[in-house]
Amino acid sequence: MKNINPTQTSAWQALQKHFDEMKDVTISELFAKDSDRFSKFSATFDDLMLVDFSKNRITEETLAKLQDLAKETDLAGAIKSMFSGEKINRTEDRAVLHVALRNRSNTPIVVDGKDVMPEVNAVLEKMKTFSEAIISGSWKGYTGKPITDVVNIGIGGSDLGPFMVTEALRPYKNHLNMHFVSNVDGTHIAEVLKNVNPETTLFLVASKTFTTQETMTNAHSARDWFLATAGDDKHVAKHFAALSTNAKAVGEFGIDTANMFEFWDWVGGRYSLWSAIGLSIILSVGFDNFVELLSGAHAMDKHFSTTPAEKNLPVLLALIGIWYNNFFGAETEAILPYDQYMHRFAAYFQQGNMESNGKYVDRNGHAVDYQTGPIIWGEPGTNGQHAFYQLIHQGTKMVPCDFIAPAITHNPLSDHHPKLLSNFFAQTEALAFGKSREVVEQEYRDQGKDPATLEHVVPFKVFEGNRPTNSILLREITPFSLGALIALYEHKIFTQGAILNIFTFDQWGVELGKQLANRILPELKDGSEVSSHDSSTNGLINRYKAWRA
C-alpha cells in the first residue's frame, strides 16, 4: 500500500473547491433538477440488496471527484494488496485476510509463501463435525445428558460479531439456547449462570492468546461454578471448548486440545466472526447456514475486488462518508436498522469502524490534519424515532444516516411490517425534504385555524430537511444477505482507511488503559492510601477503598 496524504492530492483540492459550490445546494433542489435521480444514484446487488444513495448532498460531479481521490490515493492497489495476502497491517507485520475465511471459490491465497486455504478448510470441517455432535445430541455431558445451552465467553470481536449474527439470524435458530458473556463485571456471568445447568451447558472460551484478562476471568469463574457441581476436573473436557491458538494454556485449563479451534494472526478480532470465533453462530443456526453467511460475504468480496469504483457499493458508501466527514464537518454517522433481529448491528459496526479508523497518526507515523474515522452509533427503528431522531431532524448537527430494512419479514404478524416499513420510507423522505413554513401554515388553514393566531408556534414545526441518508433495502434477511451486508460495511471501512492513509487493522488505542489497569489492580487489594497517580485518580481510588471497607 502506498502512503499518500489525501489532502495533498489534486483531487482533494478539487473537492474543496467543489464543496464551496455545493455547500448551500439542497437535496430538494437536486431532485427538482433531475427526475431520474433515483436510478442514477442507486444500485442493486445480486437482486438481494438495493442501495439508494440519491438522498445525499452529491451530484455526478461530486462522485467523479471523489473517485479521482480514490485513484490518486491508489485504492485499487490497496484492495489488491489485501486480497493477495500482503502484510498491510504493518505495525503488527500481519496480513489481513478475513476474506480468506469466506473464500468459497477456494482459490489459493498465499501468505509467506504458503496457501492458507487448506488450513482454513480443515478448521471449518472440524467445526462442522463438532457442531453436528452438539446439535444432534450425540455429544453428552458428564452425566450423560445432551447439551441444551451454549455460553460464549469472549470480548470485543470474540463477542460482538457472534452475538450480533446469532441475534440477526434468530429465525434460523435451532433448539440450543445461546448466551454471551463479555464484561469482566461479575454481574454479567452471574446472571447467565443463574439460567443454565452445569450438566447440560457447553462453554466456548474465545481468546486467541488464552490470556485476555476479561475473558479468562470469566472463564475461570465459569469453570469454578461448573466444578462446584461436577466435582472432578476431568469433566471439564466435556463442557468446555476453546477458540484459541495457545494449546499449552488451553490444556492447562482442562480443555481437550482436540476441542481447540484455531485461527491465525491474519484474522483481526473485529473481523473474526468468519473464523473459529463463529463456532457459536454454527451452534445456533447450523453449519449449512454458516456456510451461506460465508457465501454472502464472499459474493460481496468479489463485487468489491472486481467492480470499478463508480459502481462499487462499498467504495461509493465510503466516498460519500469521506465527503461528509472531511468537507461538511459531520463527525458522526448513525446506523438505523428497521428490523428488531438486527438490534446489535450498529453496536457491531461501532467497534468495526471506530476501532479500525479511530486513528490520529497516518501510515508515515505523522499526526493527520484531517478527519479520520467517524463516531458510529444507532438503534433499531422505530424505537429510535421516539428517542434521538428529534436531533437528527431539527438539531444543529448534521448526522448522515444509513437506514436498513428487509422487504420481507420473518414475522408477518397482522400489519406490523407495513407499518414498520412506512416509517422506514417516511423518515428518509422527511429528512431529505423537510416541511416548509408555508406547508405548516397551510396545514393550520386546512384545520380551520388562522395561522396568524398561531404565529408563535409555526417556527417550531418547520423542518429544514437537507439531512442526508442512505437506504439499504434487503429482499429478506437471510444468512446469505446478512453476510453480504456485513462485508459491505467491512469494505467501506477498509476503503476509508486506505484513502485516509491510516492503518485500519491495528488497535493500539486499547493498550494504554489495559496497562494502567494492570498497575492499579494490586493497589486495590489492600487498605493503604494510594498516592502514586494524579490527584484525581488517587482521590477516586481512595474513596473506592473507603466505601468498600
Curated annotation (Swiss-Prot):
The keyword Cytoplasm applies. It holds the Pfam family PGI. It is found in: Cytoplasm. It catalyses: alpha-D-glucose 6-phosphate = beta-D-fructose 6-phosphate. One of its GO terms (biological process) is glucose 6-phosphate metabolic process. Belongs to the GPI family. Catalyzes the reversible isomerization of glucose-6-phosphate to fructose-6-phosphate. This is Glucose-6-phosphate isomerase. It comes from Klebsiella pneumoniae (strain 342).
